[in-house]
UniProtKB/Swiss-Prot annotation:
Compartmental location: Cytoplasm
GO molecular function: ATP binding; CMP kinase activity; dCMP kinase activity
GO CC terms: cytosol
Entries under InterPro entries matching the protein: Cytidylate_kin, Cytidylate_kinase_dom, P-loop_NTPase
Biological processes annotated in GO: nucleobase-containing small molecule interconversion; pyrimidine nucleotide metabolic process
Stated name of the protein: Cytidylate kinase
Keywords tagged on the record: ATP-binding, Cytoplasm, Kinase, Nucleotide-binding, Transferase
Enzyme Commission number(s) from the entry: 2.7.4.25
CDD domains referenced in this protein's UniProt entry, alphabetically: CMPK
Organism listed in the record: Ligilactobacillus salivarius (strain UCC118) (Lactobacillus salivarius)
Chain sites annotated for binding ATP: 11-19
Length: 224
């Protein structure tokens, strides 16, 4: 029987991680764990509770009763926080622009890292985020680091937003993505860095199918 692998896909904002991770998981019949949605869900709960987003102690208390569920659905899995469906609301600009601050808090990273490791324990998982290959699943058999130019990533985010009825100017998105890159790669705990044993894939010139095929080839090589 082929061993069920842990597959870590990391990279900056809008590099195509979740789109690619979902497709790879589907091809392999693996579970997909969207760690970005987990941090967004905590950000949503904190904003709703009027907690200061850099108050580590208050966030720690919030997480004690924080129930997060992913429910399989088409076209994408649904996300629930304490029984409330938040699938769409956690993708709004208010959450997007605040999630880096919440993600930088030690108690939040510790709590969610533990939850993510529990989900991945049995293998057969594709997990995407910023620190999966370095911190969450350091022993993952396959580690991918996706990159793309700021311009290309802003264009992708712009198209996604338009499809959802959000019209943020392209230059604003470029600025926001560059700022998120800086915050993500300069935070003290689990900054965004490529794991030493990760394979870098530049998605700028590639279609989604081409990226998926490249990753499937890497997985194939590692599995023999």
């Amino acid at each position: 029987m082929v061993k069920k692998l842990q597959i870590a896909i990391d990279g900056p904002a809008s590099a195509g991680k979740s789109t690619v991770a979902k497709l790879v998981a589907k091809k392999l019949g693996y579970i997909y764990c969207d760690t970005g949605a987990m941090y967004r869900a905590v950000t949503y709960a904190a904003l709703k509770a009027n907690i200061s987003l850099d108050d580590d102690e208050a966030l720690k208390n919030l997480l004690q009763d924080f129930k997060l569920e992913f429910v399989p659905a088409e076209p994408e899995q649904k996300v629930f926080v304490n029984g409330e469906e938040v699938t769409q609301i956690i993708r709004t600009p208010d959450i997007t622009n605040n999630v880096s601050l919440v993600s930088a808090q030690p108690s939040v990273r510790q709590d969610l890292t533990h939850r993510q490791q529990e989900i991945a324990d049995n293998g057969g998982i594709v997990m995407d985020g910023r620190d999966i290959g370095t911190t969450v699943l350091p022993n993952a058999e396959v580690k991918i680091f996706l990159v793309a130019s700021v311009e290309q990533r802003a264009l992708r985010r712009y198209k996604e937003n338009i499809a959802k009825g959000i019209d943020t100017p392209l230059e604003v998105l470029e600025k926001e993505i560059a700022e998120r890159d800086y915050k993500d790669s300069h935070r003290k705990i689990s900054p965004l860095v490529q794991a030493k044993d990760a394979v870098k894939v530049d998605t700028t010139p590639l279609t989604i199918d081409e990226v998926v095929n490249e990753i499937m080839n890497i997985i194939e090589e590692r599995n023999h």
